[in-house]
Amino acid sequence: MGRYIGPVCRLCRREGVKLYLKGERCFGPKCPIVKRHPNKNYPPGQHGPTQRAARRPSEFALQLREKQKLKRVYGILERQFRRHFDEAERRPGLTGDNLLQILESRLDNVVYRLGFADSRRQARQLVRHGHFLVNGRKTDIPSYQVRPGDIIAVRPESRRREYFKVLEETAKNKAVPAWLSRDLETMSGRVLRLPTRDEIDIPPVNTQLVVEYYSRR
């Protein structure tokens, strides 16, 4: 499955906001977005400095930027993101809210929300390497959709690794959203229910513009 392997801080610069793609580093003074001089706050690339002073973006450009921003927050490429959008359209209710709920219900995101990884990118790698069980079964598909009642746990064999030994202590400082519960003694978490829009903590994204982007294609 394809994935972005380039510099992730470049993605934040392109969108003009912090997307929190590097975990704890994004909250500290070492974040390139924080360190960057205000006069150099423009998109990356040869023509970046001229883009800031360009004419007002078109409606399509605004829709595209919101779509790209949401994709990059969750670390998903276009084909898979479009599948998630199509599924959101089929569900009853607001398509934008459904899309966010589907993205939050991905296994790699739930691993991140439970505090078992510093970033979604790291969570995706841990899942792909088979370190987690879902309801007692090894699951290595990052896009797997969890459901209320599902139990996500670190594999007993993986708990012997140094990373997870340290994690048992460091995860104590990481808050867990209300729609999840966590037990650090068993290194597991439970999905209590699906999240509501207000409970999804991500950089501001106008999901209506994302819906409009795909509606015109």
Curated annotation (Swiss-Prot):
Role, per record: One of the primary rRNA binding proteins, it binds directly to 16S rRNA where it nucleates assembly of the body of the 30S subunit. With S5 and S12 plays an important role in translational accuracy.
Alphabetical keyword list: Ribonucleoprotein, Ribosomal protein, RNA-binding, rRNA-binding
Region (Disordered): 37-56
Sequence similarity: Belongs to the universal ribosomal protein uS4 family.
Oligomer and partners: Part of the 30S ribosomal subunit. Contacts protein S5. The interaction surface between S4 and S5 is involved in control of translational fidelity.
UniProt-recorded name of the protein: Small ribosomal subunit protein uS4
Matches recorded under Pfam families: Ribosomal_S4, S4
Keyword rRNA processing assigned: no
Record domain S4 RNA-binding: where: 105-168
Entry keyword RNA-binding: yes
Lineage: Bacteria, Pseudomonadati, Thermomicrobiota, Thermomicrobia, Thermomicrobiales
Cellular component terms per the entry's GO annotation: small ribosomal subunit
Taxonomy, superkingdom: Bacteria
GO MF terms, alphabetically ordered: rRNA binding; structural constituent of ribosome
